[in-house]
Amino acid sequence: MSFKPKNSNAPRSNNSGENTGLFPVPKGGSRKARVSLIVDLGEQNRPDFEDEKTGETKPQKPCQQVAIFADLVNDTVDYGGTIGKQHYRLLLNKQFAGEITGINFMFVPPKDAKGKIIDGKPWTLHPANLMTKLAKAVNKPDIIESGDIEQLLDCPFMAQVEVKEKDSGKQNDKGEPIIYRNVNYKGCSEVPLDDDDEPMQVAELNTPAQCITFQNAKPDDIKFIRKKLIDMIKLANDYSGSNMEKAIKEYEASLNAANDSNSEQEQQEEEKPQATKPAKKPTKKVQEPTPDDSEDGNEPW
């Protein structure tokens, strides 16, 4: 199976993480990684393009976008809950103020240094596109022309990771300062060679690499997609009637059913008659510490 841009076979004309300190974080610097998850975000509307030199704005056509993740295989962290200890999963998309930017997934015509379209050459992924840079880093340059980014899955590379710390001005229940840590992907490079001129060993993934598209999505796949990305997917122009819509609706329905079942069970426990006990002498009540509920519930996995 392959996953290519929608316009890979289209007629062509050459006429001119936020993480907040409440979640575990990896080490910064150059980290060994493998591409672990590709998520189809569908056809997304895009904001107008503004020319930095002239200030002129031009409308941009909607285009297919994706999100790409890599697991840092030397950075095992404890996410807690049902996830437990896993390799740190790093989002490669750009993020700003908590908002995620989709990666444009489309072919573009080749241009010269002056921006003029070159006739007779094949359309490819954009030279500055993250997927183009990844294809070079994993030594699979054919992906740039074929557009089959599913070939990136499980490929090893070196991820440049930036970890920034900021004091929140708050304290936890132990009186310790809460430090916010923002994790950002800054680029990629090839795995370096060892003394025998062979690529250094990169550990395998803990979980199988996946490519979740609007065509192959299943309800069980949706648990791997972050809520913010699900919200983006729901805004896609081609979401309605897609297999992705069906999978998300079934997944969310199963979550709601599980929550309703848990609520009913808790209510039944509360309604059970309690055995009366002899009255005890009043004792001084010790105030329980207030739990920290400041997490936004958007797990980084």
Name every feature range the model reports, one short phrase each.
Residues 1-301:
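Short beta-rich binding modules
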